[in-house]
């Protein structure tokens, strides 16, 4: 069984994590490293995917500045999303040819990993036809956003953002994923209290490894 090297990065700026992803993706492409996973939390950040439209940021620049929110144009797929402390972000750096070579199947695997984590807490996670991510309450509220990129050499970057206990008011600054008629929720809201972030991270690692047939090892640094 192949290994998955896991980096627990704590709180890290979006651009710093993005640069780390690019560096690791080059190393994965050349075979210097195996499949790798970054787990982290971002400070308040709005990111724009390759399908995002400016009008999906509804806050003014002054409002964003007052809340300390930065805006980053990303190279991931998808539209606009919001990151904040209390949100578990996972960036898999995978060689896709070892996992079926199908981006759609890979994204479904990411969704399934979150659905299994939610099930462990007694929450029913669901997919919504035509949309990406994981939803609850019959698709009424999104609990996990997904946006990925596949390089020319077939290596994945970016990934998923699972709302554990972020300040959900930050999502009022945007139209999340360009979808205006559905809400946003978190594990804390659904459970009535927030589970420990480290516990959720461990369960996500186990779920990803089960789905993609990997064995986790912690990075030395």
UniProtKB/Swiss-Prot annotation:
Limits of the BPL/LPL catalytic domain: 31-216
GO molecular function: lipoyl(octanoyl) transferase activity
Lineage of producing organism: Bacteria, Bacillati, Chloroflexota, Chloroflexia, Chloroflexales
This protein's name: Octanoyltransferase
Annotated active site: 177 (acyl-thioester intermediate)
EC numbers on record: 2.3.1.181
The protein's enzyme class: transferase
UniProt-annotated location(s): Cytoplasm
Keywords: Acyltransferase, Cytoplasm, Transferase
InterPro entries according to UniProt: aa-tRNA-synth_II/BPL/LPL, BPL_LPL_catalytic, Octanoyltransferase, Octanoyltransferase_CS
Function text: Catalyzes the transfer of endogenously produced octanoic acid from octanoyl-acyl-carrier-protein onto the lipoyl domains of lipoate-dependent enzymes. Lipoyl-ACP can also act as a substrate although octanoyl-ACP is likely to be the physiological substrate.
Residues annotated as binding substrate: 76-83, 145-147, 159-161
Pfam families registered for this protein in UniProt: LplA-B_cat
GO BP term (any one): protein modification process
Site note Lowers pKa of active site Cys, residues: 142
Reactions accelerated catalytically: octanoyl-[ACP] + L-lysyl-[protein] = N(6)-octanoyl-L-lysyl-[protein] + holo-[ACP] + H(+)
Family, as annotated: Belongs to the LipB family.
Domain of life of the source: Bacteria
GO CC terms: cytoplasm
Entry-linked CDD domains: LipB (cd16444)
HAMAP family: LipB
